[in-house]
Amino acid sequence: METTPLNSQKQLSACEDGEDCQENGVLQKVVPTPGDKVESGQISNGYSAVPSPGAGDDTRHSIPATTTTLVAELHQGERETWGKKVDFLLSVIGYAVDLGNVWRFPYICYQNGGGAFLLPYTIMAIFGGIPLFYMELALGQYHRNGCISIWRKICPIFKGIGYAICIIAFYIASYYNTIMAWALYYLISSFTDQLPWTSCKNSWNTGNCTNYFSEDNITWTLHSTSPAEEFYTRHVLQIHRSKGLQDLGGISWQLALCIMLIFTVIYFSIWKGVKTSGKVVWVTATFPYIILSVLLVRGATLPGAWRGVLFYLKPNWQKLLETGVWIDAAAQIFFSLGPGFGVLLAFASYNKFNNNCYQDALVTSVVNCMTSFVSGFVIFTVLGYMAEMRNEDVSEVAKDAGPSLLFITYAEAIANMPASTFFAIIFFLMLITLGLDSTFAGLEGVITAVLDEFPHVWAKRRERFVLAVVITCFFGSLVTLTFGGAYVVKLLEEYATGPAVLTVALIEAVAVSWFYGITQFCRDVKEMLGFSPGWFWRICWVAISPLFLLFIICSFLMSPPQLRLFQYNYPYWSIILGYCIGTSSFICIPTYIAYRLIITPGTFKERIIKSITPETPTEIPCGDIRLNAV
């Protein structure tokens, strides 16, 4: 193994053509003048010393194929890096492990065959999710840019991908933080001797409110509702004051104050960059695991817990013959790991050049999947307890999905446990920290992208730009804080972001593997890590992962989800609205392709060639090294 240090300082004027020189701590390569002879078929991105097929032999400077040419741009200042390696790992884990791990995976698992679902889930993770995760970490670490400007170094015509990612991130921030606002409202309401969703004697309760756990004789009817359900729907959401999407009603000032507090925490956590957010995640990324452990032990000691675990894991192998099970497995692993959102590119761009991103991808992916699996035990031990207390089947208790599973079913179970106040406080605090990590990451992806794309405008004004982003997201969230805001949240989650980010990720995978070239990409990885990705990874990146994404997209388009929330059926026009919102993001990709071809001079063929040829090389900070296999 040969290593090349980048520590020496040389004047560019003292270098001959083709030599590697240092200026201001950044390695540069002197480019020959147009009159000089060069390799006519040389790859123009500057990363490789191996000429393209058909390259001429008449060259002034020949470079051995076993040597790596070190090339870099002259940049102002050095790029910020993580304070410690563990800061990066905790940030990535905190981003990947979010609210969906707690509510979505357990529900999907038991609905799709219980323990049998783990087979398609694992297969989809190995062949689809993890390869895409690894690809984004490697791209970000090598090119050291956000999701917009990185395409100048990969395939400029696809720069619209970066803009699409930023728009999607705004849509996600508009509804995701609202769910945290609900959790914060629950947290504040939990500081009482008796949790307010325990009884039916509150001002918001109706005559249909029936307490399962009351000592009085009760009769449960089809119209009966639990105290927890009425607290969630009539007090927190106040959804009864809205007639649907056509009449959302006013804004809940309580939720507006909650989300304002959340955005304040977000701002002061990310305003200074990854060195500050990297310290915050020491709390926000580790705290959920402490609470999950406490809740798991508590749930396991409850009567009837075994019924919930059996219901969760009992395999139904016949389910594997259904296409829907494999679709759910693919979608769950993709949205859980989170490639395609620009976050992994941003986080990895702050790594040291020789950081082992391959190992990071495997470790964080395994931690994420295991967290989802363990969260199922946390949820279903409590559901088993509720089924035992109600003398019902677990299937009757576990009918709620999505946020309702947390804010109604689990909240009701906690309210009827010993020390209910304590467990309610730590549970909703856990939900908030899970959400904060993902929000930190999502906004950092946008901030890094814009700062890298417009460094002369925003590089020294990061705090102001972060404030502008946070304020924009706050105002974008107002529509989800209305009395009918829950309808908007579900619409945005199902239609506005899901299909869009899948499409963006598919185009990104194709652009890297097919246009930039899998050989070139693997050569980049080898320069960083000293070894080249094996054939398994190459096949996944070129064929399996794109097919994996195409499979999910086609399945969604062929059988789109029928939206229903509580007793409200979404009108047909709302589905069209959802598709339009989703299209508004990834429409940036074909729009930029057309724009690029129009502004590029030359014939149409020349425009195509110039537009898919990398424009700029990658800077290697002084002090880093590239590893070259000899």
Swiss-Prot record:
The keyword Protein transport does not apply. The modification Phosphothreonine is found at residue 276. Residues 1-59 are annotated as: Disordered. Residues 1-87, 136-160, 272-277, 348-360, 444-463, 517-538, 596-630 are cytoplasmic. It is found in: Cell membrane; Endomembrane system; Endosome membrane; Synapse. It catalyses: serotonin(out) + K(+)(in) + Na(+)(out) + H(+)(in) = serotonin(in) + K(+)(out) + Na(+)(in) + H(+)(out). Monomer or homooligomer. Interacts with TGFB1I1. Interacts with SEC23A, SEC24C and PATJ. Interacts with NOS1; the interaction may diminish the cell surface localization of SERT in the brain and, correspondingly, reduce serotonin reuptake. Interacts with filamentous actin and STX1A. Interacts (via the N-terminus) with STX1A (via the H3 domain); this interaction regulates SLC4A6 channel conductance. Interacts (via C-terminus) with SCAMP2; the interaction is direct and retains transporter molecules intracellularly. Interacts with ITGAV:ITGB3. Serotonin transporter that cotransports serotonin with one Na(+) ion in exchange for one K(+) ion and possibly one proton in an overall electroneutral transport cycle. Transports serotonin across the plasma membrane from the extracellular compartment to the cytosol thus limiting serotonin intercellular signaling. Essential for serotonin homeostasis in the central nervous system. PANTHER family: SODIUM-DEPENDENT SEROTONIN TRANSPORTER, SODIUM/CHLORIDE DEPENDENT TRANSPORTER. This is Sodium-dependent serotonin transporter. It comes from Homo sapiens (Human).
